[in-house]
Amino acid sequence: MRILVSNDDGVDAAGIRMLASVLREAGHEVTVVAPDRDRSGASNSLTLDLPIRLKRIDHYTVSVAGTPTDCVHLALTGLLEFEPDIVVSGINNAANLGDDVIYSGTVSAAMEGRFLGLPAVAVSLVSRNHDPKHFETAARAAVEIVARLKADPLPADTILNVNVPDLPWNEVKGFEVTRLGNRHRAEGCIAQKDPRGNEVYWIGPAGREQDSGPGTDFHAVRTGHISITPIQVDLTRYQALEKVASWVGGLSAALDQPA
């Protein structure tokens, strides 16, 4: 298969290098289009106020001065001379579980691929303290998932968010289909002062696990399983439509009132 690989940790990150290498060893034609530096947390952002510069590192690798979404968007709308069969994003060097997907550049790169018409997979290694040990396990998982998608494609609107426990392959207990869990509210920002006495702030840590019981991505990884969560671009909360329609009725009544 022709595979477009991207990430949010940057084109030189260990995870993307391992992913591209193992996919090539499996016989796939791999092209890497990835940010020139770490763009974690960039979510679905596109660069619209500046031209996007790039560097062709070799015939199969392009470094982009932009976001993960920029990378996939450019690749699929004119940068590449061919249409890939699938987009695989990763391997992220930490979890993308539950609410993490809202902020994740790794997931957003996959989402952009799906938005532009291709099957898409986001792969993350759930390491401790951002100190990943077993990228080869996550890469092996990606190879198996890509092979399965080739043999038995999923519905066209499906994005697979894959989280892999940081274990040797022979210690992984299996694959598990999950839903997204969620976290408690994020911890507070961190206030400091720069050398000139000016206020500066750092975004604080993500919240702790909240909804993380059986069936969630958190639980699967915690019990040694590879979590596969199908997600989609449509963010509509369908179960709330009837309630909100009734609520909007109260707003509509205001139109009958004199100004």
UniProtKB/Swiss-Prot annotation:
Its cofactor is a divalent metal cation. Signal peptide: none annotated. Binds 1 divalent metal cation per subunit. One of its GO terms (cellular component) is cytoplasm. The keyword Cytoplasm applies. It comes from the Bacteria. Its EC number is 3.1.3.5. InterPro entries: SurE, SurE-like_Pase/nucleotidase, SurE-like_sf. The lineage of its organism: Bacteria, Pseudomonadati, Pseudomonadota, Gammaproteobacteria, Lysobacterales. Belongs to the SurE nucleotidase family. Keywords: Cytoplasm, Hydrolase, Metal-binding, Nucleotide-binding. GO terms for molecular function: 3'-nucleotidase activity; 5'-nucleotidase activity; exopolyphosphatase activity; metal ion binding; nucleotide binding. It catalyses: a ribonucleoside 5'-phosphate + H2O = a ribonucleoside + phosphate. The gene is surE. A divalent metal cation binds at D8, D9, S40, N92. SUPFAM superfamilies: SurE-like. Nucleotidase that shows phosphatase activity on nucleoside 5'-monophosphates. It is found in: Cytoplasm. Disulfide bonds: none annotated. This is 5'-nucleotidase SurE. PANTHER family: 5'-NUCLEOTIDASE SURE, 5'_3'-NUCLEOTIDASE SURE.
